[in-house]
Amino acid sequence: MVSIRADEISNTLRERIEQYNREVKIVNTGTVLQVGDGIARIHGLDEVMAGELVEFEEGTIGIALNLESTNVGVVLMGDGLMIEEGSSVKATGRIAQIPVSEAYLGRVLNALAKPIDGRGEISASESRLIESPAPGIISRRSVYEPLQTGLVAIDSMIPIGRGQRELIIGDRQTGKTAVATDTILNQQGQNVICVYVAIGQKASSVAQVVTTLQEGGAMEYTIVVAEMADSPATLQYLAPYTGAALAEYFMYRKQHTLIIYDDLSKQAQAYRQMSLLLRRPPGREAYPGDVFYLHSRLLERAAKSNSSLGEGSMTALPIVETQSGDVSAYIPTNVISITDGQIFLSADLFNAGIRPAINVGISVSRVGSAAQTKAMKQVAGKLKLELAQFTELEAFAQFASDLDKATQSQLARGRRLRELLKQSQSAPLTVGEQIMTVYTGTKGYLDSLEIGQVSKFLDALRTHLKTNKPQFQEIISSTKTFTEEAEVLLKEAIQEQMERFLLQ
């Protein structure tokens, strides 16, 4: 018979008792009452925070948005097809955040900052909250440095500064994305990090933008955040905030950033869908009451930091799509009131072959000439006024049979000025080339040419100036002013090229 050794048993028990760690883990849990259409109703989750992440039994993550007396309304970050009624849900105690690092440059991500370009995982040691507060008044300074878009019409008449928020607004298929991608391409060598956020777009459109950026060598300083049209509404709603968090990471590291939201109409629609399914009361155009706050808290994150924070900047170019030119709809008026100006793209101008189809008359930059180099201010001062007068005259001239000489010459000048603002896609111009273009038009050098020859002449003049008068570009780049020496060089180049052009 085996003898029982009491001392051994007591020692073992004593060791076990000493090792016992009375750690109680309290988990805030709930039960799924109902699920469908990307929304789940949860019973329980008594101490959940608004905006807290919750995890379902089968792994789907959701955000608690509606905290009601009897249940919690959760929006899902996935399709939720495997979630069953009665399954358990636990609160994570975390708010949505994403990893951030330099390694994200050149990559295509989704709204959760996970790569979707098939090039492997991205290593990151830091993380940022998707929704973080905008910089306060003290930490900002006024916009004073230009952000060149490479488009003559914008840089000369609707200048954008670093830290500004400039809305690009227009109907579908008017070239809004083209203006944005051209601006990204023009940041090459300017030490600006770009973030392009595609919200609810076709996958083919996003692929086209990525290809354009790769061909232009712009992907090395660009991050693309994309949530396609078939993505859950929650992710389409989150994508712009993810883009803003990535841009902020670089801004607070004393760098300049440019972020494009393409487009905020789709984000508002995704948010409307979520709100209606959560049974929040609808307001104007069935949007929820806080749709203004949806966009204002996003766009207020764009800023120009003061010197104590390192003078970094985040420039935002939100895009909004209008329905048949109706700028007075709910979302367009909201975003116009939040931003520092708008670039209005017109379908009529686009169809008339004027591209970029910018309606200069109703486009405006509220930062104004503070965001222009001195050289551009010197040359482009009269351009907007002359074009506005021309548009008015042109409308009047349709009814007049015989016009006096002065009116005819003003109309002829206006047509040529409109012609010089035309620019092909993915062909941004340097500041020097823009100054040359505007000067040639406003000083009347193009008046003797046929309208069809204007762009040919300007192309030839750019080449001539680059090869024979390189000092011109050097003066503009180094001094940022249109000096007398630069003007003499430009006049010589124009006359030489004009003689050569007329002989052809």
Swiss-Prot record:
Topology relative to the membrane: Peripheral membrane protein
Disulfide bond sites: none
Superkingdom assignment: Eukaryota
CDD domains for this protein: ATP-synt_F1_alpha_C, ATP-synt_F1_alpha_N, F1-ATPase_alpha_CD
Keyword Nucleotide-binding among record annotations: yes
Catalytic function, reaction form: ATP + H2O + 4 H(+)(in) = ADP + phosphate + 5 H(+)(out)
One Pfam family recorded for the sequence: ATP-synt_ab
Alphabetical keyword list: ATP synthesis, ATP-binding, CF(1), Chloroplast, Hydrogen ion transport, Ion transport, Membrane, Nucleotide-binding, Plastid, Thylakoid, Translocase, Transport
Annotated positions for site Required for activity: 363
GO-annotated cellular components: chloroplast thylakoid membrane; proton-transporting ATP synthase complex
Gene Ontology terms, MF aspect: ADP binding; ATP binding; proton-transporting ATP synthase activity, rotational mechanism
Compartment(s) of residence: Plastid, Chloroplast thylakoid membrane
Primary location: plastid
SUPFAM superfamilies from the UniProt entry: C-terminal domain of alpha and beta subunits of F1 ATP synthase (SSF47917), N-terminal domain of alpha and beta subunits of F1 ATP synthase (SSF50615), P-loop containing nucleoside triphosphate hydrolases (SSF52540)
Keyword hit for Plastid: yes
Binding site for ATP: 170-177
Entry EC number(s): 7.1.2.2
Family note: Belongs to the ATPase alpha/beta chains family.
Function: Produces ATP from ADP in the presence of a proton gradient across the membrane. The alpha chain is a regulatory subunit.
Description of how the protein assembles with itself and partners: F-type ATPases have 2 components, CF(1) - the catalytic core - and CF(0) - the membrane proton channel. CF(1) has five subunits: alpha(3), beta(3), gamma(1), delta(1), epsilon(1). CF(0) has four main subunits: a, b, b' and c.
UniProt-recorded name of the protein: ATP synthase subunit alpha, chloroplastic
